[in-house]
């Protein structure tokens, strides 16, 4: 689903110079600067994009003769475009305003300069148009790493998150995690209704920022690791060295997945802290603890020869 232009106007606080149809949508985040079109070039025209008229395009129109400007602008507006945005609060030329009305096109204005507004608009559209999904789990920030805790209901995900919050880490989402893929990264957040809330079985729903302060919650976080909790299975062969790297694909983005078996006496919160610290260490290191042990074993073997 695309972004309605009328919502774009509201969210980015744009001035409406001419109102188009309410059902016009933006479906891509790219932007077109129509300088070539104003010069008469239409061999390729990305008319499905937002059309941005900055100082350069405005000045180009300004130096044209009235007859030529009338012809070029009329040709431009004959193409279906979602909206035309003029930056720097530049006053639209009469021909631009008249043709936007004639063809019922959205004509908007912003006080921002072109480069700043382009960045703002593309970031906005990237977020709104990003592929998204909702997963069952808990998302927390541990040592700056986004940890998505998954597992069957009642396994202890929320209780583990509560222990992590008590230890100074931050909650992003509990129970339902909204995830968007933006530029190859998975950005997790909480649905509005449950934002800042944590459900603990037997205790009920607790308001995390009210109990632990505003610093105990985050609005969004990039997901770095998935920690999957499951009941301990005696015959299951669990990874003991950390060399079996398993990934889970979310929105076609691979994420490192670590399975932690639950059994009495295991402090899952502490283990998750270690997993986050180890993940951050591996991001900046060329060797793992297993490599270090292997090197030491070689040293011992050489000594014993």
Swiss-Prot record:
Cofactor: Mg(2+)
Family, as annotated: Belongs to the HPrK/P family.
Protein's job: Catalyzes the ATP- as well as the pyrophosphate-dependent phosphorylation of a specific serine residue in HPr, a phosphocarrier protein of the phosphoenolpyruvate-dependent sugar phosphotransferase system (PTS). HprK/P also catalyzes the pyrophosphate-producing, inorganic phosphate-dependent dephosphorylation (phosphorolysis) of seryl-phosphorylated HPr (P-Ser-HPr).
Active-site annotation: 136, 157, 175, 240
Region (Important for the catalytic mechanism of dephosphorylation) location: 261-266
CDD domains: HprK_C
Domain-related comment: The Walker A ATP-binding motif also binds Pi and PPi.
Reactions mediated catalytically: [HPr protein]-L-serine + ATP = [HPr protein]-O-phospho-L-serine + ADP + H(+); [HPr protein]-O-phospho-L-serine + phosphate + H(+) = [HPr protein]-L-serine + diphosphate
UniProt protein name: HPr kinase/phosphorylase
Subunit and partners: Homohexamer.
């Amino acid at each position: 689903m695309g972004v309605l232009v009328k919502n774009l106007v509201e969210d980015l606080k744009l001035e409406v110079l001419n109102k188009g149809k309410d059902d016009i949508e933006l479906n891509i985040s790219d932007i077109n600067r129509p300088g070539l079109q104003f010069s008469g070039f239409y061999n390729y025209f990305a008319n499905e994009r937002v059309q941005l008229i900055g100082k350069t395009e405005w000045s180009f129109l300004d130096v044209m003769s009235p007859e030529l400007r009338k012809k070029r602008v009329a040709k431009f507006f004959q193409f279906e475009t979602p909206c035309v945005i003029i930056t720097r609060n530049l006053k639209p030329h009469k021909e631009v305003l008249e043709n936007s009305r004639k063809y019922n096109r959205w004509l908007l204005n912003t006080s921002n300069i072109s480069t700043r507004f382009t960045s703002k608009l593309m970031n906005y559209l990237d977020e709104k148009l990003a592929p998204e999904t909702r997963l069952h789990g808990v998302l927390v920030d541990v040592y700056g790493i986004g940890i998505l805790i998954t597992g069957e209901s009642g396994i202890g995900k929320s209780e583990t998150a509560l222990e992590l919050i008590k230890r100074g880490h931050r909650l992003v989402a509990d129970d339902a995690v909204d995830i968007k893929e933006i530029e190859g990264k998975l950005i997790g957040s909480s649905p509005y209704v449950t934002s800042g809330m944590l459900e603990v079985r037997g205790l009920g729903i607790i308001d995390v920022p009210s109990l632990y302060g505003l610093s105990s919650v985050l609005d969004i976080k990039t997901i770095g690791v998935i920690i999957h909790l499951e009941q301990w299975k005696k015959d299951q062969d669990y990874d003991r060295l950390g060399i079996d790297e398993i990934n889970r694909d979310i929105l076609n983005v691979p994420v490192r997945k670590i399975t932690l078996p639950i059994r009495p006496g295991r402090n899952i919160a502490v283990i998750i802290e270690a997993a986050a610290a180890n993940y951050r260490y591996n991001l900046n290191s060329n060797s793992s603890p297993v490599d270090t042990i292997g090197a030491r074993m070689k040293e011992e073997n050489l000594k014993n020869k």
